[in-house]
């Protein structure tokens, strides 16, 4: 029986008006108290190594076996419950990765932070459905401890939260960094929720399963992801069609929800009921229109349950308040209306009674208090600082050209040339070492430009086109700048008078003599200089313009909402050419193709949310990030994603990098800003998260001299063949068929004997029976008839064995369907 959770341990108090949001996650704190030394760092120390990833032969995860040693708090939950949670997680994970594993020809294993996210979810949902009052009491004990830690001064008390009520329990949020697998987490959460909701009745479903996305494009992307995870019932929401079957996942973008029915919108009342709602990029609704969105969110989930996912909750709630502050604001508005003052201290008791909040206003305050709402509902925090500290994702190099320098055309084009050379260096290294880089799963580099304005005189997209045209039209000047940059001649200095591109292009020292010509070939898809940039209006696609040099294959793509306005502006520009193509198809969906010849993608802010690609290696940001903390991190997250060696998602360490590959250049995201005020904001964000910005890191290389002893050190060595990867390892020597025992092992292996016991295990007490005269082991035993076995679905059995073989890594086992049938039907195997 589970006992009442203990309260949180006291932590160091802070006296700033607002705590770091990481320290306000009450639900997250509560979940960690299920574990001894319950912190993310403590669990990472136990589960963070690669050897704990995967499934044990008993069907449990290797994480479970490590947790069950001595780490788990047995006074809160016993081992059997942990075992049950783990089996559920393994089953759900295998279900959503089955198709992906076959597609990628690999096995996707959970990372420790993914496993903990899912384990926390299992515990929470079990308590939510089966011990709701106990869950409420435990959370309020934790919240009381949190409030006690913030009770020293008035500023501290401004960080306090009100007690949980039952209506607070039906929402969970995940603060996970971009690239940490939020989509897979979302899919498993659907299966987890349905497991507890159905409670064995597989025909029982919520009224609706709704997946909310930031825009229509991402809705379509989610459909593809659902298919890859093996879901069969899903569709884009269409209000003109009849209601789908129960259990169908309806995908709709958040912009189509409104308070009333419209031509392109649907009233949120149409979705009211016992719904399961999943909200991708949950920060979207906490901006300027937060009030309206939070009310709609409440209507959608009031009688159901919600999961939310975002990488930027911290930035999104930066301006949010707790419930008490929102209630005070409501009272001030009422006081202003009734008594023409907002000073509540000047009101007497009778006047205060007139501005007392109604139950509906109190409920609205709980809905609007975004900082408290998410502080009490974020189940797991694996935001960027933890993601980076664990070695996941790319390093970053962030530069910005200030507005004064940008006013000078020559300085701007010189800066852009350096950006282009940085991207070319990545292209050059990738193409030169493609085979060696395959081990590290490096994708073909892609240069992404993101602008704040699309049309008008100050169009950022147009500015990028003018630079590309300049580079093609001014070969001599471009060559001179490229030569200076490679030779470390100081051309662009930082505020400390340092050459910001010093030693940035060492990998190009041995590059082709005519780098400009190689840039034309690799980046612009042309072998002839002197040709002009051409903008192609792809009439057959929506919002796309292609970029090419002369008649060469397109090298770039513009993907924006208002393509006609931009194209009209291009028609008035004499520095490059333009042309209509009435029959061209969309190119955007080809960006992630292995053989894609598109090297540059230019777009607007929509790239900040959800667009997925492993290719992004260099970013150019124009007029971006002014006061938009969430967008800054979203933009950054687009580029730091990395598959890594063995799909580890991690960047390589210096000791792992082969010499001469300059792998660190390809595992670094170059971010170049122009008039982008995000620079100071983002740098401050990194420092607040405990990450040292790249411009403050000084690398010191110390030469080492080997001083090996004359006699070699004697070490113990395993016999060749003990491990699979050795020359005489079993997998390298033996290739048995299904159910075949190699001749060398005949007589050394016990014959398998399988017994399935279907008797229920019950404890009984019968007062009418005296003594212990119950017969022991009197059971009815039977064997399956071969005729029954012949009716088995052997296709399904065959595929299950193939999946198990893949999961266990038995690459040397030969699986034959007919041999499986012969074995099961009792035929002699030759």
Segments the model singles out, each with a brief description of its role:
Residues 183-194:
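Motif I (Walker A/P-loop) of helicase-class P-loop NTPases
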Residues 1-75, 101, 118-120, 125-129, ...:
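Helicase-associated low-complexity regulatory tails and linkers flanking the ATPase motor
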């Amino acid at each position: 029986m589970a006992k009442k959770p203990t309260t949180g341990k006291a932590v160091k108090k802070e006296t700033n008006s607002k705590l770091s949001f990481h320290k306000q996650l009450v639900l997250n704190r509560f979940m960690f108290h299920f574990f001894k030394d319950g912190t993310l760092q403590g669990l990472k120390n136990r589960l963070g190594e690669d050897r704990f990833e995967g499934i044990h032969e008993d069907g449990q995860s290797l994480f479970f076996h490590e947790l069950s040693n001595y780490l788990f708090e047995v006074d809160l939950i016993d081992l059997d419950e942990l075992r049950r949670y783990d089996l559920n997680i393994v089953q759900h994970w295998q279900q959503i990765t089955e198709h992906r594993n076959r597609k990628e020809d690999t096995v996707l294993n959970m990372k420790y932070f993914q496993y903990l996210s899912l384990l926390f979810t299992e515990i929470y949902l079990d308590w939510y459905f089966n011990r709701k009052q106990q869950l409420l009491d435990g959370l309020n004990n934790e919240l009381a401890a949190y409030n006690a830690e913030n009770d020293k001064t008035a500023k501290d008390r401004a960080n306090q939260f009100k007690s949980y009520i039952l209506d607070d329990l039906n929402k969970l949020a995940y603060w996970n960094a971009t690239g940490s697998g939020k989509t897979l987490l979302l899919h498993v959460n659907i299966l987890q929720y349905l497991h507890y909701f159905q409670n064995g009745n597989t025909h029982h479903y919520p009224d609706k399963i709704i997946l909310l996305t930031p825009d229509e494009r991402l809705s379509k992307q989610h459909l593809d992801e659902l298919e890859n995870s093996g879901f069969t019932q899903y569709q884009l929401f269409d209000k003109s069609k009849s209601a789908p079957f129960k259990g169908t996942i309806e995908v709709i973008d958040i912009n189509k929800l409104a308070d009333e029915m419209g031509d392109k919108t649907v009233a949120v009342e149409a979705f009211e009921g016992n719904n399961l709602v999943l909200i991708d990029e949950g920060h979207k609704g906490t901006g300027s229109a937060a009030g309206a969105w939070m009310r709609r969110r409440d209507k959608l989930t009031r009688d159901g349950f919600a999961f939310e996912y975002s990488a930027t909750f911290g930035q999104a709630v930066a301006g949010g308040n707790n419930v008490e502050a929102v209630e005070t604001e409501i009272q001030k508005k009422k006081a202003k209306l009734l008594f023409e003052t907002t000073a509540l201290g000047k009101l007497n008791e009778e006047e205060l009674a007139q501005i007392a909040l109604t139950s509906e206003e109190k409920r609205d305050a709980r809905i609007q208090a975004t900082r408290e709402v998410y502080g009490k509902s974020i189940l797991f925090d694996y935001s960027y600082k933890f993601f980076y500290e664990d070695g996941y994702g790319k390093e970053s190099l962030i530069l910005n050209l200030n507005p004064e320098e940008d006013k000078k055309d020559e300085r701007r084009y010189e800066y852009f040339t350096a950006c282009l050379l940085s991207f070319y260096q990545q292209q050059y290294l990738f193409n030169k070492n493609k085979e060696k880089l395959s081990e590290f799963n490096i994708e073909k580099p892609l240069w992404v430009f993101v602008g704040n304005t699309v049309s008008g005189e100050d169009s950022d997209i147009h500015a990028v086109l003018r630079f590309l045209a300049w580079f093609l039209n001014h070969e001599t000047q471009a060559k001179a700048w490229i030569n200076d940059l490679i030779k470390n001649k100081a051309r662009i200095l930082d505020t400390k008078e340092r050459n910001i591109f010093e030693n940035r292009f060492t990998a190009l020292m041995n590059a082709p003599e005519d780098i400009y010509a190689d840039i034309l070939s690799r980046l612009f898809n042309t072998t002839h200089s002197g040709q002009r940039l051409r903008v192609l209006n792809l009439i057959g696609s929506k919002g796309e313009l292609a970029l090419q040099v002369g008649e060469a294959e397109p090298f770039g793509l513009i993907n924006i909402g208002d393509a006609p306005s931009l194209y009209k502006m291009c028609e008035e520009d004499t520095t490059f050419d333009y042309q209509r193509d009435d029959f061209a198809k969309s190119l955007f969906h080809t960006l992630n193709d292995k053989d894609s010849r598109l090297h540059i993608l230019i777009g607007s802010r929509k790239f900040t949310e959800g667009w997925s690609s492993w290719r992004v290696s260099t970013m150019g940001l124009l007029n971006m990030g002014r006061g938009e903390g969430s967008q800054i991190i979203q933009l950054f997250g687009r580029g730091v994603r990395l598959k890594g060696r063995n799909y580890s998602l991690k960047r390589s360490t210096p000791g792992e990098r082969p010499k001469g590959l300059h792998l660190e250049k390809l595992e670094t995201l170059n971010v170049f800003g122009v008039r982008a005020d995000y620079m100071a904001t983002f740098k401050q964000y990194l420092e607040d998260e405990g990450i040292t910005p790249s411009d403050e890191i000084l690398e010191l290389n110390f030469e080492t001299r080997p001083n090996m002893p004359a006699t070699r050190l004697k070490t113990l060595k395993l016999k060749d063949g003990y491990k699979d990867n050795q020359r005489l390892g079993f997998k390298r020597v033996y290739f048995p068929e299904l159910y075949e025992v190699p001749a060398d092992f005949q007589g050394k292996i016990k014959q398998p004997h399988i017994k399935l016991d279907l008797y229920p295990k019950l404890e009984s007490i019968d007062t009418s029976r005296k003594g212990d005269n119950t017969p022991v082991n009197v059971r009815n035993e039977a064997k399956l008839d071969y005729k029954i076995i012949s009716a088995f679905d052997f296709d399904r059995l065959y595929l299950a064995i193939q999946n198990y073989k893949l999961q266990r890594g038995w690459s040397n086992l030969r699986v034959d369907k007919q041999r499986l049938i012969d074995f099961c039907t009792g035929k002699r195997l030759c």
